[in-house]
């Protein structure tokens, strides 16, 4: 490898392997044998373990390698891509329940209800796999970036949740993590002494700070891109990416058909939880002032009274993902911005 093999993802497995699966069945290999073979492949993806620092191991909850496999979705012509191998991939994962492969299921209005149910049954096992990706949002998103419709329909997932166009693009798809909760913290500190501030003012200040720090993030990301080009070209990988040979350019020099880096907004659920608690306890219930809340944060809730406040913030107010639109929409507004 030209890298550390992290996030060596396998793309739309059920698409490109389906022909071989069907051919084996026609040639007399039993479904049971093929199921065992696929199970062994899933187990094999757990052989490679990246050595991480203790902090990284804590952050990643172990040593995942990001062997992500994408299932379902659409064909390039716009039909549902779900097939019998899609089902088998989930069935075999249910048998092993290991950290890898990291399965991702693409859903859209054409998805078979039975496959959607199979996906839900697998999630219910509690491993956090598979992840769900919404074609109705992602495909138009790629179109907005100048990607052709056929290529946009053929996207896959790489690493954790990053989106890519297999064989057609190079990008540091996880080049930066934009901490939305940190932006909220900055905004609270900037306004803690303003006794007339409203909740809407806080939201607008958060958006203004997003603009400010996104620009800094872009500058930093451009430096990383340039550094990769100058100090770490990857000629072997470039041989397998469309247009690189024709252009005579390494992927780090922009030789691929599509070239863009990816960033992630993180802390979305925490942002919703925090904004909702802020709205309730400061602006609606008026139990404490904004300054008192920031002071509690600065002290890390040390002391009896601050501990009571911490317990109330955790337990009293609804949280993201519990069918409360008011909570969920707080982060939706920020993300759409």
Residue map of PLM features:
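Conserved catalytic cores of very large enzyme subunits
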Residues: 1-337
């Amino acid at each position: 490898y030209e890298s550390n093999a992290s996030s060596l993802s396998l793309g739309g497995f059920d698409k490109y392997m389906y022909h071989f699966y069907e051919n084996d069945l026609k040639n007399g290999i039993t479904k049971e044998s093929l199921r065992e073979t696929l199970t062994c492949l899933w187990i094999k993806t757990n052989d490679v373990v990246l050595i991480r620092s203790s902090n990284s191991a804590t952050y990643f909850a172990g040593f995942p390698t990001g062997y992500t496999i994408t299932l379902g979705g659409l064909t390039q012509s716009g039909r549902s891509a779900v097939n019998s191998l899609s089902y088998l991939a989930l069935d075999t994962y249910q048998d092993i329940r290991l950290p890898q492969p990291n399965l991702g299921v693409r859903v859209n209005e054409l998805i078979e209800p039975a496959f959607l149910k199979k996906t839900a049954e697998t999630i219910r096992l509690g491993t956090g796999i598979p992840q769900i990706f919404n074609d109705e949002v992602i495909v138009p998103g790629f179109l907005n970036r100048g990607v052709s419709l056929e290529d946009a329909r053929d996207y896959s997932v790489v690493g954790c949740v990053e989106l890519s166009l297999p064989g057609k693009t190079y990008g540091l798809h996880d080049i930066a993590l934009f901490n939305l909760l940190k932006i909220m913290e900055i905004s609270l500190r900037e306004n803690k002494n303003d006794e007339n501030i409203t909740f809407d003012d806080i939201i607008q200040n958060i958006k203004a700070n997003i603009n400010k720090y996104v620009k800094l993030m872009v500058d930093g990301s451009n430096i990383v891109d340039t550094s990769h080009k100058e100090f770490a070209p990857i000629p072997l990988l470039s041989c397998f990416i469309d247009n690189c040979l024709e252009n005579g350019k390494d992927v780090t020099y922009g030789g691929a058909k599509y070239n863009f880096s990816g960033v992630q907004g993180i802390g979305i659920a925490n942002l919703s939880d925090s904004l909702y608690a802020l709205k309730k306890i400061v602006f609606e219930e008026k139990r404490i002032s904004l300054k008192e809340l920031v002071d509690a944060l600065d002290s890390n809730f040390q002391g009896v009274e601050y501990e009571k406040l911490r317990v109330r913030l955790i337990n009293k107010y609804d949280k993201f993902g519990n069918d409360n639109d008011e909570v969920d929409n707080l982060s939706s507004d920020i993300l759409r911005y």
